[in-house]
Each structure stands twice: as structure tokens, then as C-alpha cells.
Amino acid sequence: MAGENVRDLSLCISGLVPESKLVSFDVAISSNQIGDTDLKRAIDPTWLHSQQNDDRLIIHALPINYSIDGNSGIKDPRGMHCGKLGVNMHVITTSIRAVKNITACVNRCHLDVDSQILGSYAAGLACLVEDEKELGVVCLDIGGGTTDIAVFYDGELVYTDAIPLGGTHVTNDIARGLSTTLSFAERMKT
């Protein structure tokens, strides 16, 4: 690893800027049998961009499950026959201005942003095992000023949010409650 130059990086987005919502979309299947091209057409983010505000950037469009002719809950519909393929997606957007500002800062360091990932999603992928995500789990990423939340169920990320309370707030509460210094409260917290 020593002597390597980093040129590209993935931008981790967290805090109160990202928004999470569930969307559904249907596409007609002309061949009656669902193939890879039909799945790509169903999860194509092009139609999502037409639904978004100009000030939002889609960072994740994650299929949760599919439906065929109105029958939902299907994980992998390839090879099945239907006239209409539906997809339920978890779409996560963020402020395009915030991403542009952070990207400009990164570019000034002679680096390029290769991709963006939601911080709580990345934390869940790094910390959780498949069984936990399958059974259902909440991953909390407690930062200094915010707590990021990622909910996994049936192996998929189904909800994300952030609340404006973090570790700094806990430290301040300990310091006030015990009438002590912030540094001592920080040591007590850990």
C-alpha cells in the first residue's frame, strides 16, 4: 500500500441533507417472459430523474422487490411470465449543491469523486452480516452532531433518516448533569 497515489474516491454523504422515499413503477413486458433487459428497464433511473426536483441528486435507487401483474413480493422475477412488471424502489436523494460544493473541495486536493454513497448505508454494509439484514435490523451511526439511521429488512435497505442529535449532545448533557468539564464528560462517555 505504501507508495500508492490515490486519485479517485467515494464520497460518503451523511447528516440531514439526504432524503429517503419509496417509489413504485410499472413497465409493460412485450415478450411475456422477463429477462435482464426488462429488469434494467424497470430500474432505469431515467424515469426517476423526471420525478425529481432539479436541486436533488439521486445517490441510490435500490430495488426492494418486484411485482408481476400486480402480485408483489418477488425478489427475482427473471424467467417468469407476465404482461406488467412492477418494481418497488428505495430512492435516496441529496442536495445537488452540497455534493457540488464537497466535490469542488475534493477536486482542489487533486482528487476526483468516483461515486457517492450514503454514510448509514455504507456503515450497514460494513458492520452487518446477511442474517441480520435478512431478519431486520436498524443500524445507527452516531456522529458528533447527527445520528444517521439505516433500516434493513429482507436483506434490503428499506429506510434511512437522520436526527440532529449526536455524541456532542450526550457529552454536553453529561457535563451539565454532573457539573463537570467537557473533557471529563467525554472520557466518561467512552
Feature-to-residue mapping (PLM):
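A short acidic Gly-Thr/Ser loop motif
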Residues: 14, 139-146, 152-155, 164-168
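Residue-level detector of high-confidence beta-strand sites
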Residues: 160-162
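Nucleotide/phosphate-binding catalytic cleft detector across ATP-hydrolyzing
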Residues: 1-139, 156-158, 181-190
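Generic structural marker for isolated residues within well-ordered, non-membrane alpha-helices
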Residues: 171
